Regions:
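Non-globular, low-confidence helical/coil segments that flank catalytic cores
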Residues: 1-186
Length: 186
């Protein structure tokens, strides 16, 4: 990454005699009573920044959170092929819910209870109906920042509690039947 923010970070760390290291797939860090496992990017590419996203899981007790950045189908397939344990309580849905992320095979390995889609107004149609449909089919409770604002998932090591800043009961992933019922009542 060569954004201005990253360049500034590199300069500040160099001024302090520090270096930036990038985690590699298969590496892990103990972080207090939690653990962070890194799964991607498997293949780094300057030309494909989405698939160059860090994919990592934070494990705390019996709960875990999988963060997929903007990883798309190709990176998901490479991670699946590597054989990592991707199961997670919470999935931060990849690439704002684009049709090229959170593929069915990837989702089947994760089987999350909750999914968080970080998305705002956009011209790309994110999150796409394809991705929302896959999450519905897997019976995953969906939270969306565009509808619910800040979303906080808290773990006590046994269970995860999710709270939202607004509209906690929003229909974040309605079925076609729910959509038509809602349209008829307005």
């Amino acid at each position: 990454a060569d954004t201005r923010s990253y360049e500034s970070l590199k300069n500040k760390t160099a001024e302090q005699g520090l270096t930036i290291t990038h985690p590699k797939p298969g590496e892990s860090l103990d972080f207090g009573s939690s653990k962070i496992e890194f799964y991607g990017p498997i293949t780094e590419s300057e030309s494909d920044r989405n698939n160059g996203s860090i994919v990592m899981k934070i494990i705390y007790g019996d709960t875990s959170f999988l963060f997929t950045g903007d990883a798309e189908r190709e990176e998901e397939q490479e991670i699946l092929s590597a054989g990592y344990d991707l199961s997670a309580t919470v999935l931060k849905v990849g690439h704002h819910g684009s049709k090229n992320s959170t593929t069915y095979p990837f989702l089947c390995e994760i089987m999350p209870k909750y999914a968080v889609i970080s998305v705002g107004d956009n011209n790309y149609g994110h999150p796409t109906e394809d991705t929302l449909s896959r999450l519905r089919d897997a019976d995953v409770k969906v939270y969306r920042t565009d509808m619910q604002g800040d979303i906080v998932a808290t773990s006590d090591g046994k269970t995860v509690t999710v709270t939202t800043k607004k509209n906690e009961n929003a229909q974040t992933n309605p079925t076609e039947n729910e959509k038509s019922t809602s349209a008829q009542s307005t």
